[in-house]
């Protein structure tokens, strides 16, 4: 259920449900963008999800999830590459969308530092590509790695060596230097690459960012070498000696070492100069020849950067000031309904083709039934209450080069006789009833596994990169094999070698296949008979269970036998198994109901049992919890802290596993009170909550 009310109007239960929804949506977006190089929502929509998630966490800190999207960077790693642990984490950036948010960021920096003088900042274009870390030892490139999840990336060293403007040897560099930057593809090179792809009958790339990411993450370096990739350096990680004293001097040093750096980088003082540079770069955007989606501001003084440090997933000393979405008007020619793997009926606008930001757009998302009607299930208006009808002139926006969205409708140009759109109440694929649960904005097919669309989409999900990742069995192959009746459920995939290696029907005889490709697929299938528990749970495609949740479940239950037994015995709303499931941080009643219901549906259970018979499931790796006296506790700071700033205290507490709240409640575990502590200290005393001073806090955490 999507709740679009202001955060301060949410109850605690509503906030918890909204955080669960946001975590699922953000995780799905991260997986599509970082792991599959195939983003499914716009940058603007993604940013809105992150902003709302953080706002709810700040309002309800005690509800902050252990798998909070605010703490995550990037997505899951692809199979086929060796893993690389980053010596210095590769983090994402906080976003700003207007001058007020930039000014707020600068003010937060001043408060954190206790700084009242002028601050210098660098401003540079935010390249829309793939982050890459390059490790040089004694001046020689020894390792290249993608960002991955920020902690661990993929080793793409041999592929990176093929990038023409990336030096493999440095003269005069520190003995150890890790250079970071962005791999991208120019518009001209992207058009030429897609031309070659089309001529060869191969799939076209959606945009330059996808082309760059897909090209760098090729298992065959020869493929990468054939793709025209480029690289801009903008940062550094591990190093044996400092590059310079300031950001702009360090970038100049990288340029002197032979790296391409962005010529539009400028030194600025204060928000007015930053905004002027943002406007200047945005005016030049269309003529740059490569994609950018904003301007990055960084504190120039590296000593101040070190003092400011980091939050869980972003540096305090940098922010990305994003560009507004690109807009165009066109006519809505029709509305098509697509059915997803969970049965969701998703409306898609069929548009008269229009150019938006240099790309021809013919389709756009309409989200759901309420979005078309202009009013949600609670009667609140969407777009001022204007509904969308076939024949309307609609405003389309596109941000981040992904699926465009219909943003508005021009009622003055509505054709006479245009009828209100009636959303189907039956599934267009199988004819089953399509229902809406109370409060849900999505209508879903009730056909389950008898619905062909759900069968196909769930099979695609099953073989996706974060699930079983069976090499040689992608979405197109799944569709073709399903269409001809060769596979209907996941277990059928593991029967392919037995059924179609020999005999009258052979995989190698199908169009697009041969003996070698068939044997390669059979070998890949055999290799996946052994699977990690979290991958299997995710691969089942149960609604609300994303990658992060699957990992939480795997860690909690430890083995497939324990997980399966618990789900089988559990009853929705009652019993020890149900309570145990709800005890997992990050699992709420909605998610738990979805899990338990799936394991009690006859068709679903039969499909799971048939699949499990083919597999050896590896037990989960159990990690030791953070050893800290405040891990898992809710801490409130009040009054004046004399030995550290409030921001530093909060950062230290969170690093030790505590949750820092801005208000005292019955769930608060500890209050740290300095001079001038007022109502919060009194409230803590009234509730019997332990209260200590700053020295006591430092002794408790071992910093005295």
From Swiss-Prot:
Residues 625-704 form the BRCT domain. DNA ligase that catalyzes the formation of phosphodiester linkages between 5'-phosphoryl and 3'-hydroxyl groups in double-stranded DNA using NAD as a coenzyme and as the energy source for the reaction. It is essential for DNA replication and repair of damaged DNA. One of its GO terms (molecular function) is DNA ligase (NAD+) activity. Belongs to the NAD-dependent DNA ligase family. LigA subfamily. It comes from the Bacteria. Keywords: DNA damage, DNA repair, DNA replication, Ligase, Magnesium, Manganese, Metal-binding, NAD, Zinc. GO terms for biological process: DNA repair; DNA replication. The active site is at 126 (n6-amp-lysine intermediate). GO terms for cellular component: cytosol. This is DNA ligase. Its cofactor is Mg(2+); Mn(2+). The lineage of its organism: Bacteria, Pseudomonadati, Pseudomonadota, Alphaproteobacteria, Rhodobacterales. It is an enzyme of class 6 (ligase). CDD domains: BRCT_DNA_ligase_like, LIGANc. PROSITE patterns: BRCT, DNA_LIGASE_N1, DNA_LIGASE_N2. Pfam families: BRCT (PF00533), DNA_ligase_aden (PF01653), DNA_ligase_OB (PF03120), DNA_ligase_ZBD (PF03119), HHH_2 (PF12826).
